[in-house]
Amino acid sequence: MTEIDRSRAFAKDVKRIVVKVGTAVVTGKGGRLALGRLGAICEQLAELNSDGFEVILVSSGAVGLGRQRLRYRQLVNSSFADLQKPQMELDGKACAGVGQSSLMAYYETMFDQLDVTVAQMLVTDSSFRDKDFRKQLSETVKAMLRMRVIPVFNENDAISTRRAPYKDSTGIFWDNDSLAALLSLELKADLLILLSDVEGLYTGPPSDSTSKLIHTFIKEKHQDEITFGEKSKLGRGGMTAKVKAAVNAAYGGVPVIITSGYAAENISKVLRGLRVGTLFHQDAHLWAPVVDTTSRDMAVAARESSRKLQALSSEDRKQILHDIANALEVNEKTIKAENDLDVAAAQEAGYEESLVARLVMKPGKISSLAASVRQLAEMEDPIGRVLKKTQVADDLILEKTSSPIGVLLIVFESRPDALVQIASLAIRSGNGLLLKGGKEARRSNAILHKVITDAIPETVGGKLIGLVTSREEIPDLLKLDDVIDLVIPRGSNKLVSQIKNSTKIPVLGHADGICHVYVDKSGKLDMAKRIVSDAKLDYPAACNAMETLLVHKDLEQNGFLDDLIYVLQTKGVTLYGGPRASAKLNIPETKSFHHEYSSKACTVEIVEDVYGAIDHIHQHGSAHTDCIVTEDSEVAEIFLRQVDSAAVFHNASTRFSDGFRFGLGAEVGISTSRIHARGPVGVEGLLTTRWIMRGKGQVVDGDNGIVYTHKDLPVLQRTEAVENGI
């Protein structure tokens, strides 16, 4: 569940809401109504109305809609000769008159479908000079709200005496943004929401990648920092008008949030207290953080520190890892105490047993982590390694070398030990790192992050590894494709899918760990028992644990299958069957073969032969890790060649699919994708390549006077290069 932002806590007490939708939200291309977008907003407002909120809508769009209709009418009534003449600009007030009826007709139709009554309320600025008018307006709106009617306000542009350019000549209101602010004050609203075509107020034009979204507007801080871009071509005011209206309302006592009308459920998110859009509040200056560090700042700092790390010698980088390993062991008691608090809190909160199991750092875990960090330190330095060397032409040498990817964003759930593995891999590979762990491991992640960053020398800086503590920062981070180079999610299918659908940054990872063990008819019973038990029970919550047991059909006749099942049942494993196995073994039939239990449970099914097992794995598996138990080498080779998974084993537990056990030192995750890295991802998976060319003044000059040799040259190992003085 997404956490409530503390600065938005007032939202829980909101009763009366004014929502203003701008022309850019109401209309789409060509000035026509954006039916889908507007319909989604109406559904949110109807739901709020049903939940007891008092909803007031201020809607722009009449002029734009009317202009579109009048242009069509003008086209229909024009001759070909008329169309060759310069076209006169349509009168805005006539457009407003025509468009208002169409706009209101849409609202009536849409809200009627949602069983909500609406009322049209057209006002002009001059009306508000009359005290009696304002009093009557308030009484009328209150009466409507008591009957669950939604008033729909708009300025009556058709009869307004104001002319373009629109200015605040009267001090009352000058567009629908300022009208919404005025109404929120007059009608004593608890909140004003201004819906725009952008996510909120930025420090510069939203199209500029360096512009930052301002989550909380602080007048004293931001009013001189903001550079406004061009306003919408459809509307009148743009962001400048919205900010001015928001400041007026906020300092009059009504909180304001500017957010996108394009994003689904944004109104509902605002009222749940989530950090969307930009908040304007009269007390905002009291909430300003001591250090205003944005997601972009964290990513940029991580990149700068990574460049300092790469500039160190191989021995210095190795020493950092040894220092981290030592620091982990020295602080073992403190780490364990914080982890115990996380585990106790998770159990008290009623988290699933599988999640709690992943959260626990068992005795000896810190020592094991320290050992893996030391193993990683002693591996060959991966940075700057020459992978290929080519003589392009005489005295023109080209080298393909290994290089860090840049800045990594790792989002992981539950397992705090993953933080240590990921951080050590990032340091060894020379990458900057941003980490976001699950809130259930908050204390464990915080202490591990502190221990690790304290061990990093000042010449590099602790900002090499940033710890993201608020879930609300993740959407911001996923937009930073110019400063974050790779995202690696480690967690549930839902988490991985959400991240893949929310970013342009390349994503490396797997959504499911549905691992199979297939026991062939020639498999040895004792070996099968050991492998199946280990694959399921060594760590049931692991992504490389067995989730489906496939058995050759011949084994159901000789008692082999019964013996296997007995072993699992006596060890507390809950069994679910496919159609054949459930009938044979009298166990519940599984709802889906594509299911990751992450607990002491698994699916069992009987297949015809190795080809049936392969087909089952391809249809229902996740391309993670699959194993065959057989003494028939020919059958084993068929399985190993044809199963299209990241890791395929013969007579070995799926639990071996692990970076540490593969000798990678540690792993940042397991990838089931087919691009860049596959299987357990260690240091190699966090590297890319660069091309280094050394010449003696050669130029292309149309390839005249140069003879390409493209001769492969021997690549010296690093130790050989040092010995030869290269």
From Swiss-Prot:
The gene is P5CSB. GO terms for cellular component: chloroplast; cytoplasm; plasmodesma. PANTHER family: DELTA-1-PYRROLINE-5-CARBOXYLATE SYNTHASE, GLUTAMATE SEMIALDEHYDE DEHYDROGENASE. Pfam families: AA_kinase, Aldedh. Substrate binds at residues 60, 157, 176. This is Delta-1-pyrroline-5-carboxylate synthase B. One of its GO terms (biological process) is L-proline biosynthetic process. Residues 1-296 are annotated as: Glutamate 5-kinase.
